[in-house]
Amino acid sequence: MFDGTSLTGWKANERPESWTVKDGAIVGDGEASHLFWMVRECGDCEFKADVKISDGGNSGMYFRTAFGPGFPKGYEAQVNSSHKDPKRTGSLYNFKNIYEQLVPPDTWFNQHIIAKGTHIVIMVNEKTVVDYTDEKNTYSSGHFALQQHNKGSVVTFKNLMMRPLP
């Protein structure tokens, strides 16, 4: 998904200046923006990354999401250790929320999403924190995207991986 040197294959929905590559990682720092992986869409898939979020920062890993302006329409695996939003890292935003801090700010962690049909699992550092069935199958297919939530948040992503599931 990411070659460690450029944003080839990625496209910001707005404010592309909020995204850079530094030390082999994708860094979000600046005004709100979402960086979409445009290479392929996916329905049943795995999506994972090593992530670090600043103190007070807010971000997310979107999957099965539509490209467009503003906040994407799709599922979001939250990335948030200490932002004022009480929904913390590992939450399936607005579907199944986690309110405890699983990872301190400025600490690398791995977030792993598995989406198969209506079943969604989110793991943080290999521990399952969400095991949810969306009976409505709200979002069945779409892009992957990374979130830069707001100025003052700094998020770093590396070792990004996606894999379609049979």
Segments from the language model and where they lie:
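Carbohydrate-interacting regions of secretory-pathway proteins
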Residues: M1-P166
